[in-house]
């Protein structure tokens, strides 16, 4: 006779998958979503539909982060948790986006994307509300920058993080 498996929720852990429904989802885009997880706290979840295994940073993710920070600054919310329960946190920028901009000669698009990312990280860094990031597994390049600028980080014991742009032949911009 099969018996049901009884699952005990750790009282100190938050299962973010429980908040992924239409009632709690405030905005959803290609690579990220904003959820209201109660008690005046927002959650930004990364979930790239293009490369879900690594959640590469793209315009959609930046737009969601900007919108979440806008909501936070209204005063209706008192904190933001950036975390999800996928395979990897964020393995950095989608280098193919940069390659396409360079190949097409449209460097303004690339410059605008870099500037937008810098503006988002500065808003996270200087937010008067707490922004808690929860990186795990891969947090490379822009993924590292997202959590390095937050007011609080709750990192997984299994975290591989850093600025790996030099491996790609690029020089990271640390002029923050």
Regions found by a protein language model. Give the residues of each.
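Glycine- (often His-adjacent) and acidic-residue-rich active-site loop
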Residues: 84-116
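Short, histidine-centered active-site or binding-site loop motifs used for metal coordination
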Residues: 46-50, 102, 165
């Amino acid at each position: 006779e099969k018996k049901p498996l009884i699952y005990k929720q750790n009282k100190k852990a938050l299962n973010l998958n429980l908040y992924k429904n239409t009632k709690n989802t405030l905005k959803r885009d290609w690579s990220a979503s904003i959820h209201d997880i109660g008690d005046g706290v927002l959650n930004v979840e990364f979930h790239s539909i293009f490369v879900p295994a690594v959640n590469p940073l793209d315009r959609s993710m930046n737009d969601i982060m900007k919108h979440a920070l806008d909501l936070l600054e209204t005063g209706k919310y008192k904190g933001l948790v950036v975390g999800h329960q996928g395979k990897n946190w964020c393995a950095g920028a989608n280098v193919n986006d940069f390659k396409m901009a360079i190949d097409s000669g449209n460097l303004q698009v690339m410059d605008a994307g870099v500037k937008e990312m810098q503006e988002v990280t500065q808003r996270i860094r200087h937010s008067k509300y707490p922004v808690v990031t929860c990186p795990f597994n891969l947090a490379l390049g822009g993924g590292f920058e997202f959590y390095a600028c937050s007011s609080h980080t709750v990192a997984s014991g299994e975290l591989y993080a850093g600025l790996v742009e030099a491996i790609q032949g690029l020089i990271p911009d640390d002029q923050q």
